[in-house]
From Swiss-Prot:
SUPFAM superfamilies (UniProt xref): DNA-binding domain of intron-encoded endonucleases, GIY-YIG endonuclease
Cofactor requirement: Mg(2+)
Entry-linked SMART domains: GIYc
Ranges where the GIY-YIG domain occurs: 4-87
Record function comment: Probably involved in the movement of the endonuclease-encoding DNA.
Organism placement in taxonomy: Viruses, Duplodnaviria, Heunggongvirae, Uroviricota, Caudoviricetes
UniProt entry tagged with the keyword Cell membrane: no
One MF annotation (Gene Ontology) recorded for this entry: endonuclease activity
InterPro entries for the chain: GIY-YIG_endonuc, GIY-YIG_endonuc_sf
Keywords: Endonuclease, Hydrolase, Magnesium, Nuclease
Protein name, per record: Putative endonuclease segD
Name of the coding gene: segD
Enzyme Commission identifier(s): 3.1.-.-
CDD domains: GIY-YIG_SegABCDEFG
Length: 223
């Protein structure tokens, strides 16, 4: 009888040395799964899967143990490194993940609002989506669209320094001082990705995607 395995794996680009660490539940360690992150998928498409190697770092008997280890390994410092593909902090073991594995639940969430839909119907759909994280594919499409736009348009906040009062306002809004992780986004320096996200009115994950993207040289971590 097959037994579910809860794995922490690492994928390495043998050309540039960049790595991706993820969590995966499977009955077969050799199922060919190569991650779901936006950046790693883009890189595999660019370099070819033959230029990547995968190794199992840990194997657990429960998802709780797996996600706990992922949280320890894939922390904020890790995702901000220039040699990693991870854009999201690890440790996502929560009930939402379980629900999203149910096809009927996913279909229900993907219902698009149609013209003439009643207010009550819209309310029910909104309620169903509350607290549910968007898929990597959805986020990737939004990020791609935004990036394409700013290839031909100047971001209104590009190269605009942050005043002391603005820094203070952002810090207060984000709940105080954040861990020091110096980065530069579109000509503006920040002490933490959260500050950059607030300044550019995007999510922290989008900031990490910008930093890890090969086609955005003006977004990087300051060493």
């Amino acid at each position: 009888m097959f037994k579910m395995k809860y794995l922490i794996y690492q994928i390495t680009n043998i050309i540039n040395g960049k790595i991706y660490i993820g969590a995966h539940a499977t009955l077969d360690e050799n199922d060919g799964y190569m991650g779901s992150g936006v950046n790693i998928k883009k890189s595999i498409k660019k370099y070819g899967i033959h230029n990547f190697k995968k190794e199992i770092l840990y194997s657990f008997s429960s998802s709780e143990e797996m996600y706990k280890m992922e949280a320890l390994l894939v922390n904020e410092e890790f995702v901000m490194r220039t040699d990693t593909y991870n854009a999201a902090i690890g440790g996502r073991g929560n009930p939402v993940i379980v629900h999203l594995q149910d096809p009927s639940y996913r279909n229900m969430l993907s219902i698009r609002t149609k013209e003439g839909m009643t207010v009550e119907a819209k309310r029910k759909i909104s309620k169903a989506k509350t607290g549910v994280k968007q898929s990597d594919e959805t986020i990737a499409k939004r990020v791609k669209g935004r990036n394409e736009y700013y290839k031909t348009h100047v971001h209104p906040r590009k190269n605009k320094p942050i005043s002391i009062s603005h820094r203070k306002a952002i810090s207060e809004k984000l709940g105080g001082i954040k861990k020091f992780i110096p980065i530069c986004i579109k000509g503006v320096k920040f002490d933490n990705p959260d500050y950059a996200a607030e300044h550019f009115k995007v999510s922290p994950k989008t900031i990490r995607n910008w930093i890890n993207a090969d086609d955005m040289p003006d977004c990087y971590r300051i060493k």
